[in-house]
Amino acid sequence: MQKGQIRVQTENIFPIIKKFLYSDHEIFLRELVSNAVDATQKIKTLSSIGEAKGELGELRIDVVLDPKEKTLSIIDRGVGMTAEEVDKYLNQVAFSGAEEFLTKYKDANIIGHFGLGFYSGFMVSSKVEVFTKSFREDAKGVYWSCDGSPEFELYEIDKADRGTRIVLHINEDSEEFLDGYRIRRILEKFCKFLPVAIYFKDESTKADDKEAKEEEESPINNTNPIWVKKPSELTNEDYQNFYRELYPAGETPLFWIHLNVDYPFNLTGILYFPKIKQSYEIQKDKIQLYSNQVFVTDEVKDIVPEFLMLLHGVIDSPDIPLNVSRSYLQGDPNVKKINAHITKKVADKLDEIFRNDRKSFEEKWESLGLFVKYGMMTDDKFLDKANKFLVMEDAADGVFYTLEEYKTAADTLQKNKEGKSVIIYTTDPVQQDAYIKAAQGKGYKVVKLETMVDAAFINNMEMKWDSVHFVRVDSDIADNLVDKQEHTDMVLSKEEEEKLKGLFGFKVSDLNLNVEVKGLSPDTPPVIATRPEFMRRMKDMAGMGGGMAAFYATMPDEVNLTVNGNHKVYQALLKESDTAKQEQQIRNLADLALLSQGLLKGANLTEFINRSVALLS
């Protein structure tokens, strides 16, 4: 029997392990089960090359909870350890590495691999015992124990089977881990896809609890998830079934991308494009990161480009650097390469679907558009590829145009005086119907840009697309949507024009009205209310938040009232001798225009209704 003290200055290491090293105490179980899996995989490898003799037996991992004894055991039939290996790996290597690291990076949040996974057990234990026997011929059983101080016990024991049993004596502060339901949930969370079968047994389960007993007889994990298989071996049904395994309540995904790279880095996984409805809250953090099938985290913003955080699925890579608890990503060149690779794979997949099955691509655009537009705003490499498959839907006939197709369809008709192509868009085809029809009457193409990201997308693309200018269909009268400096003659005299402008000089609460009399087509409405493009965009951006959001949100709405002096209604109105009636009719024309923009509310709307009834009486 050997008693001793770990041969480095370790008094400060255990408190750090217990309190600071791991962000979440429940991952102690992941670390210990992962070690058991590693030991099991090693014995399989050694057996296959003839270095481990004898029968392997059933290779499984058992997690056994005994609430009465306040112990949790992790048992494997892996390679095991000799007394020398126990001394080396448990008493020397881990601690010396930890001490060196902690001295150098005491205040840093970047923690490297130092074999401390085993010591995570001390976060929840008053004592840890190890019973182990190496696969080597003539190996003896070994017992090791430690109570969290630098002192340990190490001696030989009789042990029949190869492998390791770790017994955690759960401390008073951690008695939540004596709950069988809690342990099973932790195993399902972290070990769901480990490559060795894991069984969980709760000694407190009653003998007549058939359901619990059946659970104990089944492994908690799927040892062969589809992302470790070759894409050629899988069917669409396999991918859809795996999606349901990950997200039981989720709708069938639109499509998926199977990642399978082994050089210059290792990366496997499956990314799914979910259906997204604009009215539903979008959920991020749905991608799960694994390392050799061990769950690490669902916070993958450093690996997956931000615009793809809306995707669902699994990424598995042993080349992604993690801290000792496998919970925080470190800065690393591989991460950047993986990020770029995922972006390229997504862009290539979208381009492939667009080219090979455009009809299907357009049918999925309601969901895909959000990914594509967000990506174009945030990733220039993705932008270069996406310029070819971004599509915009015509508000009139539902035809989809790429950017170049829209430019061709609009031709010279929608080029302004600066030579830029003017993309006319609607954010609400129903409310803006009159403006859309007026624009279409001039031969213009109006497209729908009505999603939650479009306000930012429009501003962003105008900076990236030199030859394009966006104009909302209700931001000006149809004649002015494309600024060509063309004018229509006015039928009113200068004196009549000034008089008409004066009649529209009333005030409307909460609105700043700018009145202009113009000579438009006689078929154009008598009054058109529009909101200046710049101010409307600022209001849209304010709705999305940001530094100037509060400032623009409190500003009154700026509204341009364009009075069509060529409309026949004014010929009679200007001659009306009843001044009160004339003012009421003028005000009604203005209110109808404001109503079309959704700007007539509250008391102003009530007044309009009462006035309309009075005029009809």
Regions found by a protein language model. Give the residues of each.
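GHKL (Bergerat-fold) ATPase N-terminal catalytic module, capturing the glycine-rich phosphate-binding loop
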Residues: 1-177, 185
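GHKL/Bergerat-fold ATPase module in large chromosome/replication-associated machines
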Residues: 110, 128-151, 171-174, 181-617
